[in-house]
From Swiss-Prot:
It is found in: Mitochondrion. Pfam families: ATP13 (PF12921). Keywords: Mitochondrion, RNA-binding, Transit peptide, Translation regulation. Belongs to the AEP2 family. This is ATPase expression protein 2, mitochondrial. GO terms for molecular function: RNA binding. Required for translation of the mitochondrial OLI1 transcript coding for the mitochondrial ATP synthase subunit 9. GO terms for biological process: regulation of translation. GO terms for cellular component: mitochondrion.
């Protein structure tokens, strides 16, 4: 009988023609995909008898026999194809991508070669796009491959123009790429959308422009990505400029993030400032919290705080407390964070941002403010080149504003002890510029925030570290200022168990004895200096008396 050499792809082709399910060592049959134009898997060829006149049952047995003799790599490749065949599970293939990148790419290439519709492919990629932990190298590579297929399918079926489905999907790709710090890939996705608008004869800022694309344009082209800002922290005393990132490691950094297009930014600003609600019945797309947040960040990045002030006055009229805002725009924590960041970058101080945030709290009740807002304030305060005493005072003002907001929202009482925020406060407090009056602030932090940790059934490692840091710091400062009785009262009140109380008491005794000994030594040394000076003066008087 004549022999014929076939590969894996031929097996799929044969199975499809004969309507025979192909099996491997995994559960269930392999879905029979259409023949692709290229060899799907590069495997060693295997020999089977010519089967043009063989019964279907016998043929199925022969194919199964050949599959059982394949290498482990071949079996894994077939497993990937079967995984894809089950409900078109692209999300499951994501887990294999790091193990066998090439095989996974070959597997998903089947979809494009099988002429799947853009609607079907969109449905298949949603579980992948909706995952929130896609930040690794292989995750980004997998997303990039899916995006390339998506773009190719869109050009094939839609001629390159984009509809509402394409806009939504591509903006999800952009969001994930930004989260994974893949700006080049995000720019590719954005450019595809912009080309799609052009293909339809539409303008991004026209009536068919969508909020997501405008927001991502401002992030990628106009400076709204705050995490990538280079912050100049040099002052008049520094000859060399130093740059930090707000969420970086507070070291000199280099960044290629620059403004690529400010034209559309200022078009939006002009439209906002010239808009007259009397002439229009509907609120324009730019009067959206997400877009306004990014516009304000962009203006802060390019140093246009005057325009930020104009926009705030136009929309919210903060100086007129009794006048309600004209427009139905929710003031969110992210919007307030953008305002503070924009002013901080331009003015090298959080002071203007604190003033504006206070005005918002006074005019608009029950603003929901997330911990990220307060954390962002403290980060700016630490980074900016203020005198350290000024940094302490501004940090204290942030704390007072936090308490004031808490009371204004009818949620008065305790402030949840956020570990990241309080660690930043501790960094400010642990400087050498703490004064006696600052002890009241430290005690206030215990009373209104750290107290929430004492009511928890169990504490995390980070919470225990935070609590002990504040306990030890407070005891050190109390001993330093000579408040021994208050220190003992503090230990009694704020130790969380017997062992902690004993540790703090032992620390107090050691520190007190050390400071007493040091002060005693200094007093003795000072008395020696005084006595020596007195003796020298006596000798001088005796000499002068003898001469006269």
């Amino acid at each position: 009988m004549r022999k014929q050499v076939i590969g894996i792809n031929n097996i799929f082709h044969l199975a499809r023609i004969r309507s025979i399910p192909v099996h491997c060592h995994c559960k269930g049959p392999l879905y029979s995909y259409p023949v692709v134009s290229k060899t799907l898997f590069h495997t060693k060829n295997v020999e089977v008898s010519k089967y043009s006149h063989v019964e279907l049952r016998s043929l199925n047995e022969q194919i199964h026999s050949q599959l059982t003799s394949l290498t482990d790599l071949n079996k894994r490749q077939l497993l990937l194809v079967e995984t894809l065949s089950r409900n078109n599970n692209l999300e499951k293939l994501l887990d294999y991508y790091e193990i066998d990148e090439g095989s996974v790419e070959d597997a998903i290439q089947l979809l494009q070669d099988s002429n799947v519709s853009i609607q079907e492919f969109s449905s298949m990629i949603q579980p992948v796009l909706n995952r929130t932990n896609l930040v690794g190298k292989y995750h980004m590579g997998y997303l990039s491959k899916l995006m390339q297929i998506y773009i190719s399918l869109t050009r094939t079926h839609n001629g390159g123009s984009v509809d509402a489905l394409n806009k939504d999907d591509m903006n999800k790709f952009i969001k994930r790429f930004i989260e994974g710090s893949q700006l080049k890939r995000a720019q590719t996705a954005l450019q595809f959308l912009l080309d799609g608008y052009k293909e339809r004869g539409e303008d991004l800022l026209g009536p068919y422009g969508d909020k997501q694309t405008i927001a991502h344009f401002l992030m990628l082209r106009s400076g709204a990505l705050q995490d990538l800002w280079k912050i100049d922290v040099s002052n008049g005393n520094n000859k060399k400029q130093a740059f930090y990132k707000i969420n970086g490691s507070h070291r000199n950094v280099k960044s290629t993030y620059n403004v690529l297009d400010s034209v559309k930014l200022f078009e939006i600003v002009r439209y906002i400032l010239r808009y007259n609600d009397k002439d229009n019945h509907s609120q324009p797309v730019y009067f959206d919290e997400g877009i306004l947040k990014n516009v304000i960040l962009c203006l802060g990045y390019v140093g246009q705080t005057t325009l930020i002030e104009d926009i705030i006055n136009k929309i919210w009229e903060l100086d007129s407390v009794s006048v309600p805002p004209k427009y139905n725009i929710t003031v969110t924590s992210d919007l307030l964070t953008a305002i503070v960041s924009a002013y901080s970058k331009c003015g090298k101080s959080i002071q203007p941002g604190l003033v504006i945030a206070d005005k918002f709290f006074g005019k608009i009740p029950n603003i929901i403010v997330k911990d990220d807002f307060w954390i962002n304030l403290q980060k700016w305060n630490i980074i900016l080149p203020n005198k350290w005493r000024s940094t302490i005072d501004l940090s204290k003002r942030t704390w007072e504003l936090m308490k004031s907001w808490r009371n204004s929202t009818n949620n008065g009482g305790f402030i949840t002890a956020n570990v990241e925020f309080l660690n930043l406060v501790y960094k400010v407090l642990s400087s050498d510029y703490i004064k006696l009056k600052d002890l009241e602030w430290i005690y206030d932090i215990f009373q209104h925030s750290l107290v929430t940790l004492y009511s928890k059934n169990s504490l995390t490692v980070d919470e225990i570290k935070l609590l002990k840091k504040f306990q030890i710091f407070t005891i050190k400062k109390m001993v330093y200022f000579g408040h021994y009785s208050k220190c003992l009262q503090f230990i009694k009140e704020w130790s969380y168990d017997a062992a902690n109380k004993q540790q703090l008491t032992n620390l107090f005794v050691v520190l007190r004895n050390r400071y007493l000994q040091k002060r005693g030594y200094n007093q003795e040394k000072e008395m020696t200096k005084v006595q020596k000076k007195y003796d020298e003066e006596e000798q001088e008087d005796m000499l002068l008396g003898g001469l006269w």
